[in-house]
Design a protein with these regions (language model features):
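Acidic anion/phosphate-binding donor-loop and adjacent secondary structure
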Residues: 134-138, 182-196
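Alpha-helix capping/helix-boundary segments
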Residues: 99, 161-162
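Short, structured coil segments at secondary-structure junctions
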Residues: 119, 151, 169-173
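Nucleotide-activated sugar donor-binding and catalytic core shared by glycosyltransferases
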Residues: 89-90, 156, 176-177
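Conserved donor-binding/catalytic core segment of Leloir-type glycosyltransferases
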Residues: 197-202
């Protein structure tokens, strides 16, 4: 997300990241029920961490995000069209790591921009990832997300297998592209590392 933000900023865009903080106990309980449902279908999935465990694990990442990225006000529930209007957004970009994997999202429809379907904005998926080459959506999710995907102005995916998943299950064409982390140069990452203390040689 940081890499794509930097690329878009260099193209002259103002970039906001929708800050979706999903780790509250209600969402975790909902996730646990969905994991149980997947297990009943024979899928090999694990229970997620509790909100406290997840927050502790992500603390270093959160510090990076707060320092280097421009965030909207955080939400623990679904975004709404009011969020888009508040920040005067004229385009929404979805991506990348496993954003289209239902078991990793409170409501995968939001990653197909359901909350903004009534708005006149550009919709783009850059390097969106299913995280697997198997289709994990329910029939209801497939039907609704296929309709939402058809509203996108452009769709690209991170994995080659995602091209086939989009065609076979969502009925849309997708392009296979680089992971956004590869859009930057080594010098860009060197700037981020300059304040990291270096270990002394043995």
């Amino acid at each position: 997300n940081y890499a794509l933000q930097q690329v878009l900023k260099r193209m002259g865009h103002e970039v906001w990241t929708l800050d979706y903080w999903k780790y509250d106990w209600l969402n975790w309980a909902d996730m646990a029920w969905r994991v149980l449902a997947h297990k009943m279908l024979g899928h090999h999935v694990k229970f997620g961490r509790t909100p406290v465990e997840q927050q502790q694990l992500e603390m270093p990442l959160r510090r990076f995000v707060n320092r280097y990225m421009q965030l909207t006000a955080p939400r623990t529930k679904r975004f709404t069209k009011q969020t888009v209007r508040k920040y005067a957004m004229d385009a929404l970009v979805v991506g990348s790591d496993q954003v289209w994997r239902p078991m990793y999202n409170y409501d995968v429809r939001d990653c197909f921009l359901k909350f903004a379907q009534e708005l006149s904005v550009k919709r783009v998926a850059y390097a969106a990832s299913f995280g697997t080459d198997a289709w994990e959506f329910t029939d209801a999710q497939t039907s609704e997300c296929a309709a939402l995907a058809k509203q996108f102005d452009g769709i690209s995916v991170r994995e080659k297998s995602g091209v086939g998943l989009c065609k076979d299950h969502l009925g849309v064409s997708a392009v296979h592209v680089l992971d956004p982390t590869l859009l930057l140069q080594a010098e860009d990452y060197a700037v981020l590392c300059k304040d990291i203390p270096q270990r002394k040689p043995f």
